[in-house]
Amino acid sequence: MELSLDLKRQYTYADYLTWADDKMRELLNGFIRLMSPAPKLKHAVALRKIGTAMINFIDRNNGNCQVFYAPFDVRFPKNPDKTADDQIYTVVQPDICIVCDSSKLDERGCLGAPDMVVEILSLSSLRYDLNEKYTIYEEGGVKEYWVVSPKEKGINVFILQENGKYDDGTVYEGNTQVPVQTLKGLSISTEALFKD
């Protein structure tokens, strides 16, 4: 059954939980953002390669971090003391996220900032991932944010600084190794990642 939702109205996570259809949505400061139904092949391949490298690294090193793929709800409360469902206005589903603090995990996903987020660009998500989500992740305290562009065959990496702002970002292109700050000792090869 198709839900009729007012895209100009603000909603909370409590509202979000009542939407019983199969559409993928996110909430940004209470406003609905519809997500693309299915990724393109290059998006799916990049997701698989990055996620697999991270999981294998964590398993080999007996790490405490966990890797999650969309759809996996990450809730960002505006105030750490206001975590009730009807007080949360931002819920996103990153392509990949790493959570190293298990106290942030519950049956519905992650409450608070993951340690790392990876968003893989598509034509429909370009502006959204580079602007709105960048701001959400920065303000929410995500320490490492990767924006992966299969089309441009590059990765832009943002690291959260002590002042709570992301650095200017480092672009990795060509045949290079991209260090994963969250998982010290792991790097991802851009050549292997974007190989046709």
Segments from the language model and where they lie:
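Gly/Pro/Ser/Thr-rich low-complexity, intrinsically disordered segments predominantly at protein N-termini
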Residues: 1-196
